[in-house]
Design a protein with these regions (language model features):
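Non-heme Fe(II)/2-oxoglutarate
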Residues: 1-82
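Catalytic core of non-heme Fe(II) oxygenases with the double-stranded beta-helix
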Residues: 73-121
């Protein structure tokens, strides 16, 4: 893992805090499929299944969060030399003392992508 640099998440975090509780449970099929044992609540914005050539679906979190998410995504993209696109985007809310354990992602989309984690706190 390497540190890319600073990313201003002020606007994204403020927008996130304004969202209704139901948004955290809106896309449960992805939570069950991708991290069934993780004790987190998740808002999914974008999901690409089947590899980077496949279409990217906008999920429930996209409409309320995309305007605040776009500057974060653009800043992250600025750390890479070649232009790409966001294949997956999600926000995970972990409980006190919880973390995401080190793991290996698999599947055509994740194997072809850079995974970037931006801590909100």
């Amino acid at each position: 893992m390497r540190h890319l640099g600073e990313v201003d998440i002020t606007s994204f975090k403020a927008c996130l805090l304004q969202q209704p509780e139901e948004l955290w449970n809106a896309d449960q099929e992805f939570q069950k499929r991708l991290a069934p044992y993780r004790k987190s609540r998740t808002i999914y914005l974008l999901m690409t299944v089947g590899g980077p050539a496949m279409p990217t679906r906008r999920l429930t979190g996209w409409d309320p969060l995309h305007a605040a998410f776009e500057p974060v995504a653009q800043r992250i993209a600025s750390f890479y030399p070649r232009r790409g696109r966001v294949l997956n985007a999600q926000v995970a809310c972990l409980g006190p003392g919880d973390d995401i354990p080190e793991h290996e992602d698999y599947g055509p989309t994740l194997e072809a992508a850079h995974r970037v984690h931006v801590p909100l706190e």
